Curated annotation (Swiss-Prot):
Its EC number is 2.7.2.8. It is an enzyme of class 2 (transferase). The gene is argB. Pfam families: AA_kinase (PF00696). Catalyzes the ATP-dependent phosphorylation of N-acetyl-L-glutamate. It comes from the Bacteria. Substrate binds at residues 66-67, 88, 190. Belongs to the acetylglutamate kinase family. ArgB subfamily. InterPro entries: AceGlu_kinase-like_sf (IPR036393), AcgluKinase_fam (IPR004662), ArgB (IPR037528), Asp/Glu/Uridylate_kinase (IPR001048), NAGK-C (IPR041727). GO terms for molecular function: acetylglutamate kinase activity; ATP binding. It is found in: Cytoplasm. This is Acetylglutamate kinase. The keyword Plastid does not apply. The record marks 31, 250 as: Transition state stabilizer.
Length: 293
């Protein structure tokens, strides 16, 4: 390593100092998904990022999805995946697969990677400690305005008890949450990971909630990244079709989070190696930051 290269690295580290100081002992909820969960080098980079955030005094909470892995296992057992309005129809057999993949395979893979890089991760689902309360979600029919569709064991969050997360944080563990919930009768529900991350961040009054996606962030009509937005600006961008398609629910979850007391929400590109550190510890960031004003 040359002196010049060493000096560049030292400068980068010193640039992170004000952010380390600002976010010390703050909670950062990270929705982990997309390519960052399926490409091994990105998975390793993500685990290192989470461990580093913890080591410099922040409290990361990871909430993960697992759609591709669920689809892969369903295909292997010969079961067709069915979606209604973007949501997976979850019958009993599908729920068994969802619980196996989210609560077992994917969750433990993330835990193992974080621990491999020096963290102390603990895997759990929303059923553990009964901390994610849910009820059956019904979806409005597009054909009949007054008809509600039953899509199986897909859940709508009715409440979150944050105690188990707070206990783990206080003991310097890193919670890794699979988005499964339960009702008073013990019925299990598959829950959208973006929704779960936003709700958990709101209940914890987190400093940040970060949604890792397969896009750079929110783009304008010229496909240029919009680095900062408010809820009102987002409404205007939806109205003029700048924000459309799958980005609409994503920004909706981000707006819900900041309206519930989360300081800032971020939509970042999980395909960028070390995107998490770049968003939290640099002045430029790598995605779109959303805050109330």
């Amino acid at each position: 390593m040359t002196v010049h290269t060493a000096a560049e690295k030292a400068y980068i580290l010193s640039e992170a100092l004000p952010y380390i100081q600002r976010f010390y002992d703050k909670t950062i909820v990270i929705k982990y998904g997309g390519n960052a969960m399926t490409e091994r080098h990105l998975m390793e980079a993500f685990a290192k990022d989470v461990v580093l955030l913890k080591l410099v005094g922040m409290n990361p909470v990871v909430v993960h999805g697992g759609g591709p892995q669920i689809a892969g296992l369903l295909q292997r057992i010969g079961k067709q995946s069915e979606f209604i309005q973007g949501m997976r129809v979850t019958d009993e057999e599908t729920l068994d697969v969802v619980e196996m993949v989210l609560g077992g395979l994917v969750n433990q893979d993330i835990v193992t990677l974080i621990n491999k890089h020096g963290g102390r991760a603990v895997g759990l689902t929303g059923k553990d400690g009964n901390f994610i309360h849910a009820k059956k979600m019904l979806v409005k029919s597009k054909e009949k305005a007054d008809e509600m569709l039953d899509i199986g064991q897909v859940g709508e969050i009715t409440g979150i008890d944050p105690e188990i997360i707070q206990v783990l944080d206080a003991r310097d563990f890193i919670p890794v949450v699979a988005p499964l919930g339960t009702d008073a009768e013990g019925n299990a529900y598959n829950i959208n990971a973006d929704v779960a991350a936003g709700k958990i961040a709101g209940v914890l009054q987190a400093e940040k909630v970060i949604f890792m996606t397969n896009t750079p962030g929110v783009l304008d009509k010229d496909k240029k990244l919009l680095t900062g937005l408010t809820p009102r600006e987002i409404s205007d961008l939806i109205a003029d079709d700048t924000i459309s398609g799958g980005m609409i629910p994503k920004v909706g979850y981000a707006v819900d989070a900041v309206n519930s007391g989360v300081k800032t929400a971020h939509i970042i590109d999980g395909r960028v190696e070390h995107a998490l550190l770049l968003e939290v510890l640099t002045p430029e960031g790598v995605g779109t930051l959303i805050k109330r004003s």
